Amino acid sequence: MSQSDIFFDHKHIWHPYSSMVNPLPCYSVISAKGVYLKLKNGKNIIDGMSSWWSTIHGYNHPILNKSLKKQIRKMSHVMFGGITHPSAILLCRKLLKLTPKKLDCVFLSDSGSIAIEVAIKMLIQYWEALGQKRTQILTIKNGYHGDTFSAMSISDPNNSMHKIYNKFLPKNLFAETPTSSFHKEWNSIDIQSFKKIIEKKSKKIAGVILEPIVQGVGGMNFYHPTYLKEIKKLCKAYSIPLVFDEIATGFGRTGKFFAFQHANVIPDILCLGKAMTGGTITLAATLTSRNIAHTISSSKVSCFMHGPTYMGNPLACAVANANIKILEKNEWKKQVINIEKQLCQSLLPLIHHPRVVDVRVLGAIGVVECFHFVNMALIQKFFVKNGVWIRPFKKIIYIVPPYIISMNCLKKLINVIEKSLDNDTLFNVENI
């Protein structure tokens, strides 16, 4: 990669969550292997982000690579409208085997945000088929569900990165975020805000959508499993479909294969993505019940009106099958347990640091919440200089490493986080 390439990138390529006038620095990665990213200058840095929760087995995994090579000899892509293929059929078989029996219809798509859009369209079309104009979604504050329009409309309306679009988005309903954290006692007051809304607006609510247990980049909150149980009771009482967004948490990240298993509740619709292909190619899925699928399919329209160009892409399905085969060996369970133990041992004590508000650990997720906003450009540079890749946001420094990470590499991630907390220049103290 030449200096000309870097200059071109800086001038012409618009990176995510960045500016074209004053862009954040971009670090040139030329290859990746295991938990390491290799920079242009030859330096290897430890990836603490799993490329946004996705590369759970690390980079360049031989089994995943082999599945791609095998599939590409047959076909790299074919449209899914009116056509099917073995890789998609096998993947849907595997997904049905992994998920609750109630969820027996699978709609494939090409990203997590689209999986959410599909779920919302299913809800609206479901009620339309029943002769009811229900279009509002009930969720909770501090959530994040993606960057497309319907996904933005159910992400936190005030504190999210999407608030500049608020006046253009559908108006949905937001209950207060539960305050009972995962590892502490349940407080029944937490359900009251949600209960009041569902009691008052039940005839307008098309569905409830939540990130189960773990709220992602809306704030990295881990809430009590009882909250999900109470939500399920209310949804059942008012016959409102319940949707779980497991795009970030699915496939073992929290210590359970799916986060909703911590509460032993079953949704009516389930959205999956990110780690489904082991972070190799983009792929997502929305699973729903036979009741919802048949209600939609028995309406005047009779069809579900959605069809992404790359839906059911054979390469993506093939590598997803290989990824699930790795997970079926169950080595991930021990890996995540070991990560959680190390995070509890070494990350949790940072709660005593004067810059830190809270430290949270669940499965292979570690979160340090600070009093001050990070200076994104400076802290990113600091992390890279110290041999790690961590991408914070707002006041949150968090890590979601690949499950295969060694304890020495994990300790290094934690040590560099601790070191960053001692550096005043990395935080915008005025933005309290």
Swiss-Prot record:
One Pfam family per UniProt: Aminotran_3
Required co-factors: pyridoxal 5'-phosphate
Alphabetical GO biological process terms: biotin biosynthetic process
Residues the entry annotates as binding pyridoxal 5'-phosphate: G112, S113, D245, P308, T309
Location relative to the cell: Cytoplasm
Catalytic activity: (8S)-8-amino-7-oxononanoate + S-adenosyl-L-methionine = S-adenosyl-4-methylsulfanyl-2-oxobutanoate + (7R,8S)-7,8-diammoniononanoate
GO MF annotations in UniProt: adenosylmethionine-8-amino-7-oxononanoate transaminase activity; pyridoxal phosphate binding
Site residues by UniProt (Participates in the substrate recognition with KAPA and in a stacking interaction with the adenine ring of SAM): Y17
Enzyme Commission number, as recorded: 2.6.1.62
Gene Ontology CC terms: cytoplasm
UniProt keyword list: Aminotransferase, Biotin biosynthesis, Cytoplasm, Pyridoxal phosphate, S-adenosyl-L-methionine, Transferase
CDD domains linked to this entry: OAT_like
PANTHER family registered for this protein in UniProt: ADENOSYLMETHIONINE-8-AMINO-7-OXONONANOATE AMINOTRANSFERASE
Known function: Catalyzes the transfer of the alpha-amino group from S-adenosyl-L-methionine (SAM) to 7-keto-8-aminopelargonic acid (KAPA) to form 7,8-diaminopelargonic acid (DAPA). It is the only aminotransferase known to utilize SAM as an amino donor.
NCBIfam families the record matches: bioA, PRK05964.1, PRK07986.1
Family: Belongs to the class-III pyridoxal-phosphate-dependent aminotransferase family. BioA subfamily.
Subunit structure: Homodimer.
Protein name: Adenosylmethionine-8-amino-7-oxononanoate aminotransferase
Record organism: Buchnera aphidicola subsp. Schizaphis graminum (strain Sg)
Gene that this sequence comes from: bioA
